[in-house]
């Protein structure tokens, strides 16, 4: 496993995930009867600061259809959590107009790169072009100075 599991932290994420799903109207318990489901949800609400009991609640009461989605959500959250610790793996977001994103994505596909790699290449291309223009401008100025002195 690439990322270490932190049981207490992840238990809090699971609790928050289940509460969010409940508030969105999804059935988070495996109970068919409404009163049993409501009792289980009320128990869950009281367990926010008790990670071990949250895990027990999940084993006892959680709707099994949520299990896979919750695992995927927690796995993604764990990855983001550990990647955020290091500057080089931390993700940043930028706002792009849709047409700009579309053109960037098409360029990335043509080059066989990720969006990030394509952006880096575009920046490097622009820097090389700027450096080349500065060199040409300097050479042109030197040439004018030389020709201007001789004439």
UniProtKB/Swiss-Prot annotation:
Gene: matP
Similarity comment: Belongs to the MatP family.
Subunit structure, as described in the record: Homodimer.
GO MF term set: sequence-specific DNA binding
Keyword field contains RNA-binding: no
Main localization of the protein described in the UniProt heading: cytoplasm
Keyword Cell cycle attached: yes
Function: Required for spatial organization of the terminus region of the chromosome (Ter macrodomain) during the cell cycle. Prevents early segregation of duplicated Ter macrodomains during cell division. Binds specifically to matS, which is a 13 bp signature motif repeated within the Ter macrodomain.
Organism: Yersinia enterocolitica serotype O:8 / biotype 1B (strain NCTC 13174 / 8081)
The name this protein goes by in its record: Macrodomain Ter protein
Keywords carried by this UniProt record: Cell cycle, Cell division, Cytoplasm, DNA-binding
Cystines in this chain: none
Top-level taxon: Bacteria
Gene3D superfamilies xref list: MatP, N-terminal domain, Met repressor-like
Regions that span the bilayer: none
A biological process term (GO) from this entry: regulation of DNA-templated transcription
Family matches, as HAMAP family: MatP (MF_01073)
Cellular compartments annotated: Cytoplasm
A GO-annotated cellular component: cytoplasm
NCBIfam families: PRK05097.1
């Amino acid at each position: 496993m690439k990322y270490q599991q932190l049981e207490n932290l992840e238990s809090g994420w699971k609790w928050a995930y289940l509460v969010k799903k409940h508030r969105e109207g999804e059935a988070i318990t495996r109970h068919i009867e409404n009163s049993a489901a409501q009792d289980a949800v009320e128990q869950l609400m009281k367990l926010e600061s008790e990670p071990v009991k949250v895990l027990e609640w999940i084993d006892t009461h959680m709707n099994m259809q949520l299990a896979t989605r919750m695992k995927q959500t927690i796995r993604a959250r764990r990855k983001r959590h550990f990647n955020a610790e290091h500057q080089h793996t931390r993700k940043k977001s930028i706002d792009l107009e849709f047409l700009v994103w579309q053109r960037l994505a098409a360029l990335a596909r043509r080059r066989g790169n990720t969006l990030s790699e394509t952006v880096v290449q575009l920046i490097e291309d622009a820097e090389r072009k700027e450096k080349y223009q500065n060199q040409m401008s300097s050479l042109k100025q030197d040439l004018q100075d030389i020709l201007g002195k001789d004439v």
